[in-house]
């Protein structure tokens, strides 16, 4: 963790030195980070900090056991802006809580703190079309692409945790077209093993992802199609529908970009070709929000230990004018075949939120009933603070 504190300290010093030596104007507002921009418009830089404090308790119905924990769920340091010209943008994000860094304790990630979430350059080489290069989120399901700062519930659903594509390093091409009816397209080629992997790409596997979206009623206010809850209270009905197909060739991880690296008794990687379909929709109007997602992962070989399965999640919520919200969510996941590492489960969740300053300062709670091999009831309370 010493290196993490060094990064934070260096970042603060960098901002201060730029301000003192160059007298670059600093702009700061709640929830928008600290922003600086060169007088000659040669670069801009925004620094943001946020964290989530989570209490979680679980009551197991058969045994009667009660487990609880209190922890810093996420702690993030974010940089973004443009370099040289406004059409060359960048984003860097570090995850520095223990929960953020724990995935680095394996050979394939070098037994180091896996703190780098995003490190990507975005070049808009023609209006409406961007080339992304680096490590960032793949164009997967909507629930995953929505920032963890902007979630409607305390955390994402089981469908997301079992089937999302997460982050990887590679190239992405993204386009936006239309004004009344809006279309978005994305195509990505990535390494296929997930973020932070330092070993050679095994067996020359690659991952190919394509996504198509349509917004038949036009753009959402304040990019509300990728924000949980309708805190903007969309003045007119808005709908977005998205479809993603992902093919991960020769992946040694149980869920493609995530999960365990699978090996045989001779410590050789085991591979599978994973095909994943993700379909999602979101509707918002005057504080009312509805969203749904379907996921399906399969393979022609079905090697034991991989996460073949399907899942569905839907949620309905309403934000009152007082900025309190009540929301409900239903989730179901099922394995496909006898070799899947995914277990069947159903989850029913009721959530309550108070948005004090939008998603930048909020308190959220939810209670869930989990119907699985070991049924339990879970209660969570989380505070989010973003500067």
List each model region and its residues.
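Short sequence motifs at beta-strands and strand-loop junctions characteristic
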Residues: 26-28, 68-71, 111-113, 161-165, ...
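Outer membrane beta-barrel transmembrane domains
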Residues: 254, 317-364
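Bacterial Sec-dependent N-terminal signal peptides
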Residues: 1-24, 387
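Outer-membrane beta-barrel biogenesis signature
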Residues: 19-47, 219-238, 251-254, 357-361
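Detector for outer-membrane/organellar transmembrane beta-barrel domains
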Residues: 203, 213-216, 221-335
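Outer membrane beta-barrel
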Residues: 32-195, 201-218, 237-240, 247, ...
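Outer-membrane beta-barrel domain signature
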Residues: 23-25, 36, 63-67, 104-109, ...
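Outer-membrane beta-barrel "beta-signal"
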Residues: 208-219, 350-356, 361, 375-387
């Amino acid at each position: 963790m010493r290196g993490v504190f060094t990064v934070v300290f260096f970042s603060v010093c960098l901002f201060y030195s730029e301000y003192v030596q160059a007298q670059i104007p600093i702009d700061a507002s709640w929830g928008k980070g600290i922003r600086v921009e060169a007088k000659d418009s040669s670069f801009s830089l925004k620094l943001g900090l946020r964290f989530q404090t989570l209490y979680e308790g679980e009551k197991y119905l058969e045994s009667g056991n009660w487990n609880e924990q209190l922890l810093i769920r996420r702690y993030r340091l974010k940089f973004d802006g443009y370099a040289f010209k406004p059409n060359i943008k960048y984003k860097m994000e570090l995850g520095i809580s223990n929960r953020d860094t724990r995935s680095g304790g394996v050979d394939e990630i070098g037994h180091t703190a896996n703190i780098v979430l995003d490190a990507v350059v975005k070049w808009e080489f023609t209006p409406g079309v961007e080339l992304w290069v680096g490590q960032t989120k793949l164009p997967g399901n909507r629930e995953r692409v929505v920032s963890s700062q902007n979630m409607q519930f305390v955390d994402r659903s089981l469908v997301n945790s079992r089937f999302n594509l997460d982050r990887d390093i590679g190239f992405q091409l993204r386009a936006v077209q239309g004004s009344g009816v809006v279309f978005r397209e994305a195509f990505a080629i990535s390494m296929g093993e997930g973020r932070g992997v330092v070993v050679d790409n095994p067996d020359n596997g690659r991952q190919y992802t394509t996504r198509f979206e349509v917004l038949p009623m036009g753009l959402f206010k304040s990019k509300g199609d990728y924000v949980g809850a309708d805190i903007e209270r969309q003045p007119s009905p808005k709908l977005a529908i998205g479809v993603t197909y992902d093919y991960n060739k020769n992946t040694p991880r149980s869920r493609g970009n995530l999960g365990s690296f699978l090996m045989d008794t001779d410590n050789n990687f085991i591979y599978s070709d994973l095909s994943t379909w993700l379909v999602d929709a979101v509707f918002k109007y005057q504080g009312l929000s509805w969203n749904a997602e379907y996921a399906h992962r399969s393979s022609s070989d079905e090697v034991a230990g991989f996460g073949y399965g399907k899942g569905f999640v839907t949620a309905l919520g309403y934000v009152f004018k007082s900025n309190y919200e009540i929301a409900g969510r239903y989730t179901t996941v099922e394995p496909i075949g006898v070799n899947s590492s995914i277990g069947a489960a159903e989850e029913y969740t009721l959530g309550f939120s108070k948005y004090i300053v939008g998603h930048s300062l909020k308190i959220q709670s939810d209670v869930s009933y989990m119907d699985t091999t070991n049924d339990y009831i879970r209660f969570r309370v989380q505070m989010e603070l973003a500067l």
